[in-house]
Amino acid sequence: MEYSIFHCEGGIGKNILATAVVSSLKKSEPKRQIIIVSAWPQVWFNNPDVYQVYQMGQVANFYKNFVKDKDCKIFRQDPYHHQDYILNKKHLIDVWCDLVGAKNDEQGPKLYFSPLELDSIRQKMVNGLTKPIFLLHINGGGPNGNGYSWYRDLPMQNAIDIVNYFKNDYHIYQIGYEKQPLIQGCNKLTLQTREILAAPLFSKKRLFIDSFSHHAAKALSQKSVVCWIGNKPEILGYDGHINIFPDAEPKFDTLHSSYLDDADISGNPIQFPYDRLKIFNSEEIINKLIEL
């Protein structure tokens, strides 16, 4: 048997985006069985392009079964380190496809759920509610990250405006880790990781940032409003979403501590370039959400 070993480091969103790369890789060499090694194997469950999925660090007998004396190709490149990504020349999917030697099939990311799995998630989210669901994700990063990153998180001042506008007519579920603040009027979405990935399917309104939620929504064909600050939708986003940018203009030259990127994604306060905290136009976001 011929194998392609696809090693995917990084977070949930990067893994969801990588499903588009694996789809292209499978089309380029359909006889090869693709094996995924990832910190987030839940993203890859039920994926028809994937032969087996391994949790990173839990790879007993992997070398013996798939590498030693086997016909295998190993793809362990990190597209974040490629100059076409760093210099904002190509979308990350295109950069990654170039690295693995596959043509982008333009299908975009995909997530796969069985009907019974979706029914179970729907019951957890919807049962007992009398209002449609508004799904809100304003803070990115992992479970051990900082509570707030100005580089990609929606400012609390904007988020409160939006919640206050919609809270009487919608049941607002907020996606976030324990350290991240829960806005008054919102309900914490307490589901397992894979269940949260399916949550866009059961929502009427969706407001996201540059985090895994907007990748999941795209993978499920759920048009969403996405707010961008540091990163660019041309590189990490999708045309199908409504992409919104700050109306505040940078006022300070904060590149004194920057290396290959303009700022650290963790949101170092010394790199904040604006002269006000409320950098988005809340009314613009509300109007775009009304259109959904």
Report each predicted region and the residues it spans.
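Catalytic machinery of carbohydrate-active enzymes
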Residues: 1-292
